[in-house]
Amino acid sequence: MSRQIMVGGVAVGGGAPVSIQSMCNTATEDVEATVQQILRLEQAGCEIIRVAVPTEEAARAVPAIKARIHIPLVADIHFDYKLALLCAEGGIDKIRINPGNIGAKERVRAVADACCERGIPICIGVNGGSLEKDLLVKYGGVTAQALVDSAMGHVRLLNDCGFNDICISVKCSRVPVNMAAYRMLHEQTDYPLHLGVTEAGTPEMGVLKSAIGIGGLLCMGVGDTLRVSLTADPVEEVIAAKRILQAAGIRRSGPDLISCPTCGRTKYDMIPIAREVERRLKDCAKPITVAVMGCVVNGPGEASGADVGIAGGKGEGLLFAKGKILRKVPQEQLVDALFQEIDKL
């Protein structure tokens, strides 16, 4: 089991639930826009939020933002260590630094000392796009071992400064390399791991990459917190993260819809019905399994683990629960009958 750190009031690692993170795409110095986006993210289920801090103005906005939100705030720092010091003074809940560009050891020590004084954890954020040049030369490019060496080198640097309140992130856009690096870290250290696939892309492909790269690791017991990085509204990152956690069997945050792919036995127009059920389930928060099956022959049996479901036939279908048939229902009433049963659960 990984060791535990506290990011504000959220425990990360040490057996705590895998937490969902996102990152604002507003200008951090625009306090109103940033706060409004964070409030939307909170409502969607985000539990830790990160903001970019490229300027002193952005760093000085931290206290005003923190005063109006309800989840921990993380500062993303590149190049200028003094911005990390300002954020620490402003009450930030965690600081993310990149070992490839933060600078000399004295600068890292200054950040570590400031965080140690205030109980602020540091996330070592290694990115394939900004690996140290000597590692790129040594390994001939961005490899899993290069990512791990960068992270562990910075862990040692922080440890030398007497700092141990650490989590680690190693991200690149190539899923197999990403997964290999995280597996290696999982074997080499007990610091909590922040999972993600960087530059994953737009939702269509980015969710797929993240489902494999993050979900695969979660299924192996690797990872303590995650962010799904998408070229989209950050709320979509949170929705995708919740779905990945649910699909991996880690956290239930609502209903799970199962449906068959249809075949020649299907005697009704099932695909639009499945989509209608999916649409209506978005307003349901119950941790239940709902089935939409293609035929009355196999449907109830194949979906016997579902809390409730429907199986279509010619002109009518079956409503069932836990594999037991409840009644026959005319096809045009199937969806309404299904949701009447869901309301009873």
Question: Where are the predicted features?
Answer:
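N-terminal amphipathic alpha-helix/helix-capping segment at the start of soluble metabolic enzymes
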Residues: 1-23, 116, 279
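Active-site mouth loops of central-metabolism enzymes
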Residues: 15-33, 52-54, 71-79, 135-148, ...
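Hydrophobic faces of well-ordered beta-strands that scaffold small-molecule active sites
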Residues: 18-24, 49-51, 73-77, 95-97, ...
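Alpha-helix-loop-beta-strand connector modules within alpha/beta enzyme cores
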Residues: 55-77, 110-122, 182-193, 277-281
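Glycine-enriched alpha-helix->loop->beta-strand junction motifs that scaffold or abut catalytic
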Residues: 68-71, 88-95, 116-119, 186-192, ...
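Hydrophobic or amphipathic alpha-helical targeting/insertion segments
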Residues: 82-123
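Catalytic alpha/beta core domains of metabolic enzymes, predominantly
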Residues: 126-127, 135-282
